[in-house]
Amino acid sequence: MIEIEEIAPEELPAFWDAHIRYLVEDGIIPDDEDIEYFTGDEYRGIIEAHMRRAEDRHYVVYFLHDGERIGAASYCIYEKESGKCFILDFWVFPAFRGSGTGRRCFEALARYAKAGGAVWYELNSEKEASVRFWKSLGFKESGTDEYDMPLFVKGKPEAHDDTDCL
Protein backbone atom coordinates (compact mmCIF):
# COMPACT_ATOMS: atom_id res chain seq x y z
CA MET A 1 0.00 0.00 0.00
CA ILE A 2 1.19 3.50 -0.82
CA GLU A 3 1.38 5.97 2.05
CA ILE A 4 1.74 9.75 2.03
CA GLU A 5 4.43 11.70 3.87
CA GLU A 6 3.64 15.41 3.99
CA ILE A 7 6.64 17.71 3.74
CA ALA A 8 6.81 20.72 6.07
CA PRO A 9 8.14 24.01 4.67
CA GLU A 10 11.29 23.55 6.77
CA GLU A 11 12.00 20.28 4.93
CA LEU A 12 11.82 21.80 1.44
CA PRO A 13 15.59 22.23 0.85
CA ALA A 14 16.06 18.44 0.58
CA PHE A 15 12.98 18.16 -1.64
CA TRP A 16 14.18 20.78 -4.13
CA ASP A 17 17.08 18.58 -5.31
CA ALA A 18 14.72 15.74 -6.25
CA HIS A 19 12.25 18.22 -7.76
CA ILE A 20 14.67 19.86 -10.19
CA ARG A 21 16.13 16.47 -11.14
CA TYR A 22 12.61 15.29 -12.05
CA LEU A 23 11.80 18.46 -14.00
CA VAL A 24 14.99 18.22 -16.06
CA GLU A 25 15.31 14.43 -16.50
CA ASP A 26 11.66 14.01 -17.48
CA GLY A 27 11.92 16.88 -19.96
CA ILE A 28 9.36 19.06 -18.20
CA ILE A 29 11.66 22.10 -18.31
CA PRO A 30 14.10 21.84 -21.21
CA ASP A 31 15.68 25.29 -21.26
CA ASP A 32 18.09 27.17 -19.01
CA GLU A 33 15.64 30.01 -18.35
CA ASP A 34 13.09 27.60 -16.85
CA ILE A 35 15.77 25.80 -14.85
CA GLU A 36 16.92 29.13 -13.43
CA TYR A 37 13.33 30.04 -12.47
CA PHE A 38 12.52 26.70 -10.78
CA THR A 39 15.79 26.73 -8.83
CA GLY A 40 15.48 30.40 -7.88
CA ASP A 41 14.39 32.09 -4.70
CA GLU A 42 11.27 33.63 -6.28
CA TYR A 43 9.58 30.33 -7.24
CA ARG A 44 10.69 28.50 -4.12
CA GLY A 45 9.64 31.42 -1.91
CA ILE A 46 6.16 31.43 -3.45
CA ILE A 47 5.72 27.69 -2.83
CA GLU A 48 6.91 27.99 0.77
CA ALA A 49 4.63 30.97 1.43
CA HIS A 50 1.66 29.09 -0.03
CA MET A 51 2.46 26.10 2.20
CA ARG A 52 2.15 28.37 5.23
CA ARG A 53 -1.13 30.10 4.34
CA ALA A 54 -4.40 29.02 5.91
CA GLU A 55 -6.64 29.23 2.82
CA ASP A 56 -5.91 27.50 -0.50
CA ARG A 57 -2.85 25.88 1.04
CA HIS A 58 -0.13 24.25 -1.05
CA TYR A 59 0.98 20.72 -0.13
CA VAL A 60 4.18 18.88 -1.01
CA VAL A 61 4.21 15.14 -0.33
CA TYR A 62 6.29 12.03 -0.87
CA PHE A 63 4.80 8.68 -1.84
CA LEU A 64 6.08 5.85 0.38
CA HIS A 65 6.09 2.11 -0.21
CA ASP A 66 7.28 0.02 2.74
CA GLY A 67 8.72 3.21 4.22
CA GLU A 68 10.79 4.05 1.13
CA ARG A 69 10.22 7.24 -0.85
CA ILE A 70 9.17 6.26 -4.36
CA GLY A 71 7.79 9.52 -5.74
CA ALA A 72 6.40 12.93 -4.91
CA ALA A 73 3.65 15.40 -5.70
CA SER A 74 2.67 18.97 -5.03
CA TYR A 75 -0.85 20.31 -5.16
CA CYS A 76 -3.14 23.05 -3.93
CA ILE A 77 -6.74 22.68 -2.76
CA TYR A 78 -8.99 25.64 -3.62
CA GLU A 79 -11.96 25.64 -1.27
CA LYS A 80 -13.73 28.49 -3.09
CA GLU A 81 -13.56 26.55 -6.36
CA SER A 82 -15.71 23.69 -5.11
CA GLY A 83 -12.76 21.82 -3.64
CA LYS A 84 -10.57 21.88 -6.75
CA CYS A 85 -7.27 20.10 -6.19
CA PHE A 86 -4.79 21.45 -8.73
CA ILE A 87 -1.86 19.06 -9.13
CA LEU A 88 1.29 21.02 -9.97
CA ASP A 89 3.73 18.11 -9.87
CA PHE A 90 3.30 14.35 -9.75
CA TRP A 91 6.03 11.85 -10.37
CA VAL A 92 7.21 8.37 -9.52
CA PHE A 93 10.97 8.02 -9.23
CA PRO A 94 12.30 6.18 -12.33
CA ALA A 95 13.39 3.05 -10.43
CA PHE A 96 9.80 2.49 -9.27
CA ARG A 97 7.88 3.16 -12.49
CA GLY A 98 5.73 0.50 -14.10
CA SER A 99 3.43 -2.18 -12.71
CA GLY A 100 0.71 0.34 -11.84
CA THR A 101 2.79 2.29 -9.32
CA GLY A 102 1.64 5.66 -10.70
CA ARG A 103 -2.00 4.61 -10.45
CA ARG A 104 -1.56 3.47 -6.85
CA CYS A 105 0.25 6.72 -6.01
CA PHE A 106 -2.59 8.79 -7.47
CA GLU A 107 -5.16 6.73 -5.55
CA ALA A 108 -3.23 7.40 -2.33
CA LEU A 109 -2.96 11.09 -3.19
CA ALA A 110 -6.70 11.29 -3.93
CA ARG A 111 -7.56 9.73 -0.54
CA TYR A 112 -5.15 12.06 1.27
CA ALA A 113 -6.31 15.18 -0.58
CA LYS A 114 -9.98 14.28 -0.07
CA ALA A 115 -9.38 14.28 3.69
CA GLY A 116 -8.05 17.83 3.22
CA GLY A 117 -11.13 19.00 1.31
CA ALA A 118 -10.42 18.00 -2.30
CA VAL A 119 -13.52 17.20 -4.37
CA TRP A 120 -12.18 17.20 -7.92
CA TYR A 121 -8.82 17.35 -9.70
CA GLU A 122 -7.22 19.50 -12.38
CA LEU A 123 -3.74 19.55 -13.89
CA ASN A 124 -1.92 20.60 -17.02
CA SER A 125 0.13 18.23 -19.14
CA GLU A 126 1.43 18.09 -22.66
CA LYS A 127 3.89 15.19 -22.64
CA GLU A 128 2.38 12.31 -24.59
CA ALA A 129 3.17 9.62 -21.99
CA SER A 130 1.80 11.79 -19.17
CA VAL A 131 -1.38 12.56 -21.08
CA ARG A 132 -1.94 8.82 -21.66
CA PHE A 133 -1.36 8.17 -17.96
CA TRP A 134 -3.84 10.80 -16.78
CA LYS A 135 -6.46 9.74 -19.32
CA SER A 136 -6.08 6.13 -18.11
CA LEU A 137 -7.10 7.41 -14.67
CA GLY A 138 -10.26 9.00 -16.05
CA PHE A 139 -9.05 12.57 -16.57
CA LYS A 140 -10.71 14.41 -19.46
CA GLU A 141 -9.37 17.26 -21.57
CA SER A 142 -10.77 20.63 -20.52
CA GLY A 143 -9.34 23.46 -22.58
CA THR A 144 -6.02 25.14 -21.90
CA ASP A 145 -4.46 27.19 -19.13
CA GLU A 146 -3.05 30.73 -19.31
CA TYR A 147 0.18 29.33 -20.81
CA ASP A 148 -1.77 27.47 -23.52
CA MET A 149 -1.02 24.09 -21.94
CA PRO A 150 -3.77 21.45 -22.14
CA LEU A 151 -5.83 21.11 -18.96
CA PHE A 152 -7.28 17.84 -17.69
CA VAL A 153 -9.99 17.36 -15.07
CA LYS A 154 -11.45 14.48 -13.09
CA GLY A 155 -14.58 14.54 -10.97
CA LYS A 156 -15.46 18.18 -11.61
CA PRO A 157 -18.99 18.91 -10.34
CA GLU A 158 -21.45 20.05 -12.96
CA ALA A 159 -22.36 23.72 -12.70
CA HIS A 160 -25.79 24.31 -11.20
CA ASP A 161 -28.08 26.30 -13.46
CA ASP A 162 -30.39 28.49 -11.34
CA THR A 163 -32.75 29.04 -14.29
CA ASP A 164 -34.03 25.48 -13.77
CA CYS A 165 -35.69 26.69 -10.57
CA LEU A 166 -37.78 29.43 -12.21
Task: Report the location of each language-model feature.
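Extreme N-terminal starter segment of soluble prokaryotic enzymes
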Residues: I2-E3
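Acetyl-CoA-dependent GNAT
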Residues: E6-G83, L88, F93, Y112, ...
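Short coil/turn motifs at secondary-structure junctions
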Residues: Y78-K80, A95, E128, P157
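Short loop/turn motifs at secondary-structure junctions
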Residues: F86, G117-V119, G138
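Conserved acetyl-CoA-binding loop-helix of GNAT-fold acetyltransferases
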Residues: V92, G98-R111, S136
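Conserved active-site alpha-helix within GNAT-family acetyltransferase domains
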Residues: R103, E126-T144, D148-P150
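Conserved GNAT acetyl-CoA-binding A-motif
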Residues: A113-E126
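Terminal substrate-recognition subdomain of acyl/acetyltransferases
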Residues: K140-L166
